[in-house]
């Protein structure tokens, strides 16, 4: 169906690839690139309560959801930014584990040897991303899943998909609560225990030369709380008297904290050795893969534990919970948490290079709320640097939209449906033919990309701009994304039904409105661009789409209707070409 514009489309993709690699790098910076940005007023002074235009409502929803819909835009226009956020926070959380459990029960009822797996975790993710009413909670939970990373790529984690669904639920449940609670829930979750190896971590044994596993102790500081270096509230590095960055922790801190994370294992009605090890089925609680781990005093270190200036005294009887409380209190109270976590949330939701003033305002809101994630999320989304249209128009503002969010934005904008009702999009990790990214399947604990990633040998790198998502953007993934969207726009997305016996891919998009405009190329381009990009389309993209549409011959319908099929195919091809070219354009790939 796309053959008639293959040459033009190929030319466009080459241009898009080059633009994404170069021009986009300059466009995925932050509003704080110059001195003026640092003076942008905070939320109280500079943010209107109601979007002045539908375009601004659409831009807000691009940051706060998995993609704007007309209904979302209408709601934000009716009640305003802050009220919409409050309304979203009040919505009950959707449960991925409940969906997984229901699917598992259905499969086992049909075949006792069968069970649900990773696919059902991804089905639930996309169902909620595309249809869920708690868009903000799910969007923030997804952002948190890229900070507090567990990955189904790991065989232990991937082999326990019910636990992964429960982990995502846990992030959603804590998305607007206390950071201190969130951090403890992360630390005690069995999936994190498996992933970073503090599940069944044993106390030191000098006689055997055994020391506690330090993996989680290191990462909970480096990645989940305080980072490697001491920070100013603005996120800038604190410098010592020697002019060098000051490290937040030492090897001794890691060793001391590692003792805290000994003696933690599966939850259950007792703390028998067999339950700690999970030796037999009778000692394996059905909920053990998603219920917070419990402490087993017989495996917990008795010795003094020193870290970050705190001390847990030697214990006559090991008390894992008391040790953990001191550790969590110490980490959550560290002044680095606000700027360290806040900056990453800004990067995930709004812009890759926020100004120091923006980061400081978010950190201050977090601190004033006593470590309140709700206050942090509001500050991220309502800050004038996030909402000011002039700032957003700056050449270095915004971020490269990651592949998963490009897909969800498209499918939400077009009201995609699922033939099975399950949204069987599945794993999309292949770089050459798919998105090169699958939710909850990062290659390592460092996520798909690092928050401080600077693309080498680029103009952005020379300018000191960060572009995290560019770490998974290269010639192969650009072509893979284009191929995946080409096939998806033409035929649909995902597998051919739950049993692979359906006649078409499960997730379908209707182009009826676009097909009706196929004989009016400019109107067709306007509709597609308004639906997918709004004002972000600019002025250069429309002529390209119009030219591509015109290049597809649309024959006149013969009086006897004998060529109706050819006419219908041409109209459909024109409509799909317009959509496809918008989806691979740099204007869509960059979130402003």
Regions found by a protein language model. Name each.
Residues 23-48:
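Bacterial Sec-dependent N-terminal signal peptides
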Residues 2-17:
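Bacterial N-terminal signal peptides that target proteins for export
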């Amino acid at each position: 169906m796309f053959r008639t514009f293959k040459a033009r489309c190929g030319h466009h993709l080459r241009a898009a690839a080059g633009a994404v690699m170069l021009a986009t790098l300059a466009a995925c910076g932050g509003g704080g690139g110059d001195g003026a940005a640092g003076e942008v007023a905070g939320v109280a002074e500079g943010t209107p309560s109601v979007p002045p235009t539908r375009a601004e409502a659409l831009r807000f929803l691009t940051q706060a959801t998995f993609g704007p819909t007309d209904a979302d835009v209408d709601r934000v226009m009716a009640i305003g930014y802050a009220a919409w956020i409050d309304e979203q926070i009040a919505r009950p959380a959707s449960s991925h584990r409940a969906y997984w459990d229901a699917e598992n029960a259905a499969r086992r009822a049909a075949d006792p040897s069968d069970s649900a797996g990773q696919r059902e975790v991804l089905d639930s993710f996309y169902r909620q991303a595309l249809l869920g009413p708690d868009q903000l909670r799910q969007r923030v939970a997804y952002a948190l899943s890229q900070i507090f990373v567990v990955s189904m790529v790991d065989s232990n984690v991937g082999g326990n998909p019910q636990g992964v669904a429960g982990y995502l639920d846990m992030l959603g449940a804590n998305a607007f609560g206390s950071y201190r609670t969130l951090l403890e829930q992360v630390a005690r979750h069995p999936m994190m225990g498996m992933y970073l190896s503090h599940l069944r971590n044993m106390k030191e044994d000098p006689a055997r030369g055994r020391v506690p596993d330090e993996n989680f102790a290191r990462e909970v500081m480096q990645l989940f709380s305080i980072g490697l270096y001491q920070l100013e509230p603005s996120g800038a590095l604190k410098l010592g008297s020697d002019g060098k960055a000051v490290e937040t922790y030492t090897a001794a801190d890691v060793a001391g904290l590692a003792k805290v994370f000994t003696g933690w294992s599966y939850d259950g009605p007792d703390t028998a050795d067999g339950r700690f090890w999970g030796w037999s089925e009778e000692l394996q609680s059905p909920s053990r893969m998603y219920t917070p781990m419990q402490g087993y005093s017989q495996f917990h270190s008795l010795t003094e534990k020193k870290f970050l200036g705190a001390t847990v005294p030697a214990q006559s009887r090991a008390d894992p919970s008391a040790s953990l409380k001191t550790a969590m209190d110490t980490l959550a109270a560290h002044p680095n948490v606000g700027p360290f976590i806040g900056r990453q949330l800004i990067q995930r939701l709004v812009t890759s290079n926020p100004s120091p003033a923006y980061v400081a305002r978010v950190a201050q809101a977090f601190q004033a709320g006593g470590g309140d994630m709700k206050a942090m999320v509001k500050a991220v989304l309502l800050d004038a640097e996030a909402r000011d249209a002039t700032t957003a128009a700056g050449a270095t503002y915004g971020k490269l939209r990651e592949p998963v969010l490009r897909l969800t934005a498209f499918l939400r904008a077009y009201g995609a449906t699922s033939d099975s009702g399950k949204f069987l999009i599945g794993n999309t990790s292949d770089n050459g033919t798919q998105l090169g990214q699958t939710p909850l399947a990062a290659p390592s604990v460092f996520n798909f990309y690092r928050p401080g990633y600077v693309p080498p040998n680029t103009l952005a790198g020379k300018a000191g701009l960060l572009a995290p998502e560019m770490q998974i953007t290269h010639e192969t993934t650009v072509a893979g994304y284009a191929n995946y969207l080409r096939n998806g726009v033409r035929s649909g997305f995902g597998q051919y039904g739950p049993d692979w016996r359906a006649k078409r891919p499960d997730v379908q998009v209707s182009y009826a409105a676009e097909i009706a405009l196929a004989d009016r190329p400019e109107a067709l381009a306007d509709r597609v661009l308004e639906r997918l990009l709004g004002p972000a389309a600019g002025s250069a993209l429309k002529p390209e789409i119009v030219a591509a549409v015109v290049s597809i011959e649309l024959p006149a319908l013969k009086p006897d209707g004998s060529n109706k099929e050819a006419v219908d195919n041409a109209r459909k091809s024109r409509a799909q070409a317009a959509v496809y070219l918008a989806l691979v354009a740099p204007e869509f790939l960059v979130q402003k």
